[in-house]
């Protein structure tokens, strides 16, 4: 575990890059860290390779796993997650976006909004990202002059329209035009655009009201072992606070929770005395083997949440144009349901008066999962099938 204590003097905000594959999300992430390192103390420059760090990614040139970095503006400390852009990895987008208080939507001016741009905006709405700032990337490739300006204006108009369709504030959302690659390469005019972007992020994206007074809950994103110390579970603290030596329940996948004591807490390799709502924390768990905890379970204040398999839900079935199904689904349909950091297969029961659900429908139905999961009223989820998002929903009532 870490040696240095974490500094909490600045307001902490979780943010991330989203958008279509190859529009420049990872390059922009590297540019933000690198440009801020020149202007604000306490930042470390990053290159593309250090963020695009999973082996599969570089072989295929596509970002797969979510990558976490940190940086500071004059006003705030940010934890930044670089979200996957490739359609096959929307599953990871769901776990990554669930960690965001706001997003930077990256759109290449050369392409305009693409299918994954739309899907990421929809998913951001679904997982509760309240606001986003748009970075219109690669504007240098449009050339100069009035035609280039008109092209950029047109793309900006399309993006604003798309944001409004999904109930974001398309009219007032800040749009910054720039070149992530040229900023990363140190060209002053483009570096200034990155600073302008971060100023907009500071001002447009609100610091979240952290739910510190509610019972502690953290969804497990990853688990690893520290030799001689024990097992560490990492994830974003959804609500509440946790102090060292307090007990937590490991909930999900089994009928009964398993209880353990937290003997160490860290964030970005620095020690914490307390983990608070909004923190990306690593918790050292006493007496727990690597096999006794897995991604998708949650750590919670003892007795505050129990696993369930059956619940009522309000769902929206995506239209074909939104990347959803082309045909209706009927009772006994068995897709995957994605909660926080987990996916589990479940069957559906339709109300008596409904025979089928057509793409574009809003409907109330009952979900019956094959494994018990920590859910409660208000828990949001996505419905996936064959590698694509086909619906989005929210738990309205627990059945069992």
From Swiss-Prot:
**Coiled-coil annotated spans:** none
Cross-referenced InterPro entries, in alphabetical order?
EF-Tu_GTP-bd, EF-Tu_GTPase, EFTu-like_2, EFTU_2, G_TR_CS, P-loop_NTPase, Small_GTP-bd, T_Tr_GTP-bd_dom
What does the entry list as the binding residues for GTP? 19-26, 82-86, 137-140
- Give the region (G2) as residue ranges: 61-65
Q: Where is this region: G1?
A: 19-26
For this chain, one GO molecular function annotation is: translation elongation factor activity
Its Enzyme Commission number(s) read: 3.6.5.3
- Choose one Gene Ontology CC annotation of this protein and give it: cytosol
Q: Where is this region: G3?
A: 82-85
In this chain, the stretch annotated as G4 covers 137-140
Q: Does the keyword Magnesium apply?
A: yes
Query: Which keywords appear in this protein's UniProt record, sorted alphabetically?
Result: Cytoplasm, Elongation factor, GTP-binding, Hydrolase, Magnesium, Metal-binding, Nucleotide-binding, Protein biosynthesis
tr-type G domain: which residues?
Answer: 10-209
Positions contributing to Mg(2+) binding = 26
The question of whether Protein biosynthesis is a record keyword is answered with yes
Subcellular location(s) of the protein:
Cytoplasm
Annotated catalysed reactions: GTP + H2O = GDP + phosphate + H(+)
Question: What ranges does the record give for the region G5, renumbered to this chain?
Answer: 179-181
Which HAMAP family does UniProt cross-reference here? EF_Tu_B
Q: Which NCBIfam families match?
A: EF-Tu, PRK00049.1, PRK12735.1, PRK12736.1, small_GTP
Complexes and interactors: Monomer.
Sequence similarity: Belongs to the TRAFAC class translation factor GTPase superfamily. Classic translation factor GTPase family. EF-Tu/EF-1A subfamily.
Q: What does this protein do?
A: GTP hydrolase that promotes the GTP-dependent binding of aminoacyl-tRNA to the A-site of ribosomes during protein biosynthesis.
* Protein name listed in UniProt: Elongation factor Tu
Q: Could you tell me which species this protein originates from? A: Mycoplasma mobile (strain ATCC 43663 / 163K / NCTC 11711) (Mesomycoplasma mobile)
**Encoding gene per record:** tuf
């Amino acid at each position: 575990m870490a040696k240095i204590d974490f500094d909490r003097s600045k307001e902490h905000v979780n943010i991330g890059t989203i958008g279509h594959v190859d529009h420049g999300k990872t390059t922009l992430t590297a540019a933000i860290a690198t440009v801020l390192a020149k202007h604000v103390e306490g930042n470390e420059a990053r290159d593309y390779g250090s963020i695009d760090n999973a082996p599969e990614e570089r072989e295929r040139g596509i970002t797969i796993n979510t990558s976490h970095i940190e940086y500071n503006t004059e006003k705030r400390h940010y934890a930044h997650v670089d979200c996957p852009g490739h359609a096959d990895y929307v599953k990871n987008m769901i776990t990554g976006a669930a960690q965001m208080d706001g997003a930077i939507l990256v759109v290449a001016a050369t392409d305009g909004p693409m299918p994954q741009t739309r899907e990421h905006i929809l998913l951001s709405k679904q997982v509760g990202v309240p606001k986003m700032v748009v970075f219109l990337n690669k504007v240098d490739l449009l050339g100069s002059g009035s035609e280039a300006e008109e092209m950029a204006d047109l793309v900006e108009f399309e993006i604003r329209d798309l944001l409004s369709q999904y109930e974001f504030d398309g009219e007032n959302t800040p749009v910054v035009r720039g070149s992530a690659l040229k900023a990363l390469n140190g060209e002053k005019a483009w570096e200034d655009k990155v600073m302008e972007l971060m100023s907009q992020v500071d001002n447009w994206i609100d610091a979240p009201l952290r739910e510190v007074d509610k019972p502690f809950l953290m969804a497990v994103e990853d688990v690893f072992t520290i030799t001689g110390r024990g097992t560490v579970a990492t994830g974003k603290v959804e609500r509440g606070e946790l102090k060292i030596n307090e007990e937590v329940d490991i909930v999900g996948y089994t009928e009964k929770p398993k209880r353990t004591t937290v003997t160490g807490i860290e964030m970005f390799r620095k020690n914490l005395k307390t983990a608070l709502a909004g923190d990306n924390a690593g918790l050292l768990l006493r007496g727990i083997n690597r096999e006794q905890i897995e991604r998708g379970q949650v750590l919670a204040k003892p007795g505050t949440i129990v696993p369930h398999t059956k619940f009522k839900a309000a769902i929206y079935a995506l239209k074909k144009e939104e990347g959803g199904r082309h045909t209706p689904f009927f009772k006994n349909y068995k897709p995957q349901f994605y909660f926080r950091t987990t996916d589990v297969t479940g069957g559906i029961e339709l109300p008596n008066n409904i025979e089928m659900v057509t793409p574009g429908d809003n409907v109330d139905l009952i979900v019956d999962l094959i494994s018990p999961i920590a859910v409660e009223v208000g828990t949001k989820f996505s419905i996936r099938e064959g590698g694509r998002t086909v619906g989005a929903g929210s738990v309205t009532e627990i059945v069992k």
